[in-house]
UniProtKB/Swiss-Prot annotation:
One annotated GO biological process: response to ethylene
Induction, as annotated: Repressed by sucrose and gibberellic acid (GA). Induced by cold stress in roots and shoots. Induced by salt stress in shoots. Down-regulated by abscisic aci (ABA) in shoots.
The species this protein was found in: Oryza sativa subsp. japonica
Chain ranges of the HTH myb-type domain: 88-144
Compositionally skewed regions (Polar residues) per UniProt: 8-18
Misc: Plants over-expressing MYBS3 show increased tolerance to cold stress.
Subcellular location: Nucleus
Protein name: Transcription factor MYBS3
Matches recorded under Gene3D superfamilies: Homeodomain-like
CCHC-type zinc finger locations on the chain: 3-20
Family matches, as InterPro entries: Homeodomain-like_sf, Myb_dom, Myb_dom_plants, Plant_Stress_Dev_TF, SANT/Myb, SANT_dom
Amino acid sequence: MTRRCSHCSHNGHNSRTCPNRGVKIFGVRLTDGSIRKSASMGNLSLLSSAAGSTSGGASPADGPDAAPTAADGYASDDFVQGSSSATRDRKKGVPWTEEEHRRFLLGLQKLGKGDWRGISRNFVVSRTPTQVASHAQKYFIRQSNMTRRKRRSSLFDMVPDESMDLPPLPGGQEPETQVLNQPALPPPREEEEVDSMESDTSAVAESSSASAIMPDNLQSTYPVIVPAYFSPFLQFSVPFWQNQKDEDGPVQETHEIVKPVPVHSKSPINVDELVGMSKLSIGESNQETVSTSLSLNLVGGQNRQSAFHANPPTRAQA
């Protein structure tokens, strides 16, 4: 028993494998009329026209949904009814020319990054500040990706032309004529005339000796040019300062700092006069027997004998 499709009533397949049912994605069945033109499906108009010619008008692409499919561009461009091709050109944008990009580079070099309004007003007059900022972003991305891989030549690969800043030289004027048009140097003063004359004579003598050594053919080809003015040589003496030492003369002595010595108005007090102690001796002579005794004589003290001192020998005991 052959299979019979419940969708198209044809034999040989079922409803799941029927080619006329379309595509089912996430439970939603899509037909050819609901598919609009996209970037990956740019040949839908050709397919619809080919299907219409083969099927004789039986294809669903010839229905009312075929009009937006056959139109050029994206379906989102025709969202507003009655839109013209001018709006599409405005959305697409006008590409930058080389002259505009050259002016943009010059403005970027002069004003720096961020001043898109100044670049738009002074350099790229035909572009708005927003367009200048967008162009700068693309330019910087291109410059950062230059070393990654080899790319096609683009407008962003242009090098800023620095010759636009420099004003052109007037025609027929050469640098040599500019040097000749410079004002002459002021004449030397009377004080310097003698030195300058001596230097001039020495220079002329050197030039004459050089011309005598050079052959005739070189003189005609390379003439000797003598400068018209020489800077004078001034002789001046170096002043001798007084604080400098003369090698031949005597060496001067430096001043010494005199420190004051304090002078006491009163004589210093002798401690031995206030408190006197006897000297200890071991009977060196008979005359010093009296002084050998230990005694402490205080100023203004009593004359009585101390208990700690021995009695001096008397004449009777002797």
